[in-house]
């Protein structure tokens, strides 16, 4: 399974998603800010990043671009209607909140598969 960096500032969402991904066999590292995520990206093996678009400080799309430069596939998420439109314009897979955990699982699998075939 994959090493996933979950970047989410809502602690409830972070807990639910992290626990779900762990039950699927993924190793999950959680960060509540882009700054914290950048530290993990520099020091931890990451196969995929799951990033909330709207966070305090640096926006998720900027962090996604940084992860992309490191060769790490990234999925963006958001529940804010304005950011749903903005983030869906980026070249990264996008998952609007609220989402079904089964849809998250499918998107992670397809994103990881695509990154291995590119």
Language-model features: locations:
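Conserved acidic carboxylate
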Residues: 8
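Two-component/phosphorelay signaling modules centered on CheY-like receiver
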Residues: 11-29
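Acidic, metal-coordinating helix/loop segments flanking the phosphotransfer/catalytic sites
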Residues: 30-48
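Acidic catalytic/metal-coordinating carboxylates
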Residues: 33, 58-62
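Active-site residues of response regulator receiver
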Residues: 52
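Receiver (REC) domain active-site loop signature in two-component systems and cognate sites
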Residues: 55
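Hydrophobic/aromatic residues positioned on beta-strands within the core alpha/beta folds
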Residues: 75-78
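C-terminal output helix
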Residues: 99-111, 116
